[in-house]
Amino acid sequence: MYEGLLNNNLPARFEYISDHLLVDGAHNPDAIIELVNSLKNINKPIHVVFACFRDKNIERMLISLGEISNDIVLTTFNHNRARNEEDYFLYLGDYKFYQDYHDAIDNALNNYPDDLVLVCGSLYFAELVRSEYKNEK
């Protein structure tokens, strides 16, 4: 049983889709803090693509992500609870918004090919990105 737990890879939980694309379903402040702590020793710049549901404490999550990245972009995805551009209005002065998350991810991957692109903020969003980008490998 112990070995089974050690070898259990949960989809979209600290999962590298490629050498430069990491998806994680961290979707609340405590989970984001743990994710940030796991990434503090990464020896390359990190670019964050963030999307979450409207009921989440976005401010605490963005502050924590700022500890590991100077490049955080906000986006949305197709779900009735997902934050859209209007829901991010308090943060649009500090963060760029992409209506299409594919554009946000592809822009980061293409402009920073040697860096790490982190997708997080919602387990649903992370799983969506995982399923789409894993098939492109």
Positions of predicted regions on the chain:
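Active-site catalytic pocket residues across diverse enzymes, especially alpha/beta-hydrolases
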Residues: 39, 133-137
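C-terminal helical cap/extension that packs against the catalytic core
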Residues: 60-116
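A glycine-rich beta-strand to alpha-helix segment
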Residues: 104-134
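Nucleotide phosphate-binding/pyrophosphate-handling subdomain across enzymes
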Residues: 1-71
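A general structural signal for well-ordered alpha-helical segments in protein cores
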Residues: 11, 32, 85-88, 101, ...
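Short glycine-rich anion-binding loops that position phosphate/pyrophosphate groups of nucleotides
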Residues: 27, 53-55, 78-81, 123-125
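Generic beta-sheet signal
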Residues: 20-21, 46-48, 95, 115-119, ...
